[in-house]
């Protein structure tokens, strides 16, 4: 019995060659629309879909394959006489191979000038229906949705006259992933169009970006996926100019680094980071000096760290960085001379370029945190704050220099793991106290790191002080200015302690926990 294939693709890559090989193997080919035109033009004989259905394509191609003669040919079980008899009685010929890919919905909605009508028109109906019918009946039908699978199908057909069950099952699984992702993207688009912020069903679709050697630890398997609709300012979209493949921990740290620097837009800034905590932030009138400040913040912890710069890397800055062992450097761009310096004898140094002008768009997407049996969803902590809204709660007002330093410190503390404390001046971090289970311990760690550099220093806390003992420790160290959210039932005790020691303290009214 002559075998039949149905081919209807939007992506024509490789389809003519695939169809030519099928014809050599004696297959009949049913085709539709533009695919039929392409195959006929290449000399591949095809059967028009309306010759199979008895109905013309209609409604601008919206209705062409949704017909019992198509789906009966796909769904009929070859092992059931009743199915085969029903097909025969209704003049339904069996279809053994389906090659379909779908209307380019993703590519359409990514166009900057796309209209809602264009998006709707590029929702495929018949294609997913054929794919799902064929995949359901994979015991008998081979289904191909990805041109990358053409070769293996042809190899098996040439060798055995049919594909193996294992191949058909694998391809069916691929189809169900593909159609699920396609529908998820449509659902995401429509959800955004109607402004639904808390959908009762959450559908997400990501594409495999990188199969990883391992995860956070060698005993953990891991992979890296990218959003189906990519975010330009993201590690997933970064252009890698040099170095080894990014590891799991590299990606998490690099993501934290590029989030931090989004808050330092207006002056040249360098952020150094280790284990998702900033270990040095420097700000200056030029990027080379900003590097100096970031490095001087903690010359020990920066070893093996990640550095992100918000200005082009020039040769002078590259020379300074070249002398320090770093895992990753991230910047908007690099001069040719800077790249030559950084890559000299450092083939493993990972160098990434990112479009910093796309930072604002990256702040919109939600954050997803997996928990056992569930998923937490929240928007990013990107609230826009103004010092004009802050409240000085002590008798002493900050000096102009202290006010500048407090603003710098408040930007920096946002990304320190809770309980988080940071000590800074007006242009660099001096001490970081991250992740302690009691706040006074974080205060002591940050102050200890900053010792001998506390003249003119200020301190920021990511959340309120539960007791006045924090202020006591700060005053004892000689720090004269504090910024924190406020909000404790014992705020007045902390205020009184600050007044007692002549400190100035600012309440922002905004907490920045980070876990």
Curated annotation (Swiss-Prot):
CDD domains: IMPCH
Reaction(s) the record says it catalyses: (6R)-10-formyltetrahydrofolate + 5-amino-1-(5-phospho-beta-D-ribosyl)imidazole-4-carboxamide = 5-formamido-1-(5-phospho-D-ribosyl)imidazole-4-carboxamide + (6S)-5,6,7,8-tetrahydrofolate; IMP + H2O = 5-formamido-1-(5-phospho-D-ribosyl)imidazole-4-carboxamide
Example of a GO MF term: phosphoribosylaminoimidazolecarboxamide formyltransferase activity
GO biological process: 'de novo' IMP biosynthetic process
Residue ranges of domain MGS-like in the record: 1-145
Listed SMART domains: AICARFT_IMPCHas, MGS
Keyword ATP-binding assigned: no
Family assignment from sequence similarity: Belongs to the PurH family.
Official protein name in the record: Bifunctional purine biosynthesis protein PurH
Taxonomic placement: Bacteria, Bacillati, Bacillota, Bacilli, Lactobacillales
């Amino acid at each position: 019995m002559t075998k039949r294939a149905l081919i209807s693709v939007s992506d024509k890559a490789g389809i003519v060659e695939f169809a030519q090989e099928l014809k050599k193997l004696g297959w009949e080919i049913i085709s539709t629309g533009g695919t039929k035109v392409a195959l006929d033009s290449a000399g591949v004989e095809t059967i028009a879909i309306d010759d199979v259905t008895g109905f013309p394509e209609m409604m601008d191609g919206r209705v062409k394959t949704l017909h019992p003669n198509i789906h009966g040919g796909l769904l009929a079980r070859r092992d059931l006489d009743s199915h085969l008899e029903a097909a025969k009685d209704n003049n339904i010929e069996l279809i053994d191979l389906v090659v379909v890919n779908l209307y380019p919905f993703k590519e359409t909605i990514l166009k900057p000038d796309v209209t809602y009508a264009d998006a709707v028109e590029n929702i495929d109906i018949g294609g997913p229906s054929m794919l799902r019918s064929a995949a359901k009946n994979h015991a008998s039908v081979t289904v191909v949705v990805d041109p990358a699978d053409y070769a293996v199908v042809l190899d098996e057909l040439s060798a055995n006259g049919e594909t193996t069950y294992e191949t058909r099952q694998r391809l069916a699984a691929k189809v169900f992933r593909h159609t699920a992702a396609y529908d998820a993207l449509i659902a995401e688009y429509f959800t955004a169009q109607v402004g639904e912020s808390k959908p009762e069903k959450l559908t997400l679709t990501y594409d495999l970006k990188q199969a990883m050697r391992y995860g956070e630890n060698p005993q953990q398997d891991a992979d890296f996926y990218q959003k189906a609709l990519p975010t330009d300012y993201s590690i997933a979209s970064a252009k890698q100019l040099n170095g080894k493949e990014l590891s799991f921990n590299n990606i998490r740290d690099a993501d934290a680094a590029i989030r931090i620097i989004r808050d330092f837009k207006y002056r040249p800034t360098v952020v150094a980071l280790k284990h998702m905590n900033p270990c040095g932030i420097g700000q200056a009138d030029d990027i080379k000096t900003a590097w100096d400040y970031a490095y001087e913040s903690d010359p020990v912890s920066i070893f093996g760290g990640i550095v992100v710069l918000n200005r082009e890397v020039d040769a002078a800055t590259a020379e300074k960085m070249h002398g320090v062992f770093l895992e990753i450097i991230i910047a908007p761009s690099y001069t040719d001379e800077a790249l030559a310096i950084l890559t000299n004898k450092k083939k493993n140094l990972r160098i990434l370029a990112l479009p910093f002008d796309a930072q604002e768009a990256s702040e919109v997407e939600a954050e997803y945190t997996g928990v056992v049996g569930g998923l937490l969803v929240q928007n990013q902590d990107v609230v826009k704050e103004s010092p004009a809204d802050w409240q000085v709660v002590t008798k002493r007002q900050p000096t102009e220099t202290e006010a500048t330093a407090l603003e710098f410190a408040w930007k920096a503390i946002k990304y320190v793991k809770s309980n988080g404390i940071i000590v800074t001046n007006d242009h660099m971090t001096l001490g970081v106290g991250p992740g302690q289970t009691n706040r006074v311990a974080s205060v002591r760690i940050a102050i200890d790191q900053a010792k001998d550099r506390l003249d003119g220093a200020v301190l920021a806390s990511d959340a309120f002080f539960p007791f006045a003992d924090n202020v006591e420790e700060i005053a004892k160290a000689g720090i004269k200015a504090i910024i924190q959210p406020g909000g404790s039932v014992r705020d007045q005790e902390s205020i009184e302690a600050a007044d007692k020691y002549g400190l100035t303290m600012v309440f922002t009214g905004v907490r920045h926990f980070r876990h």
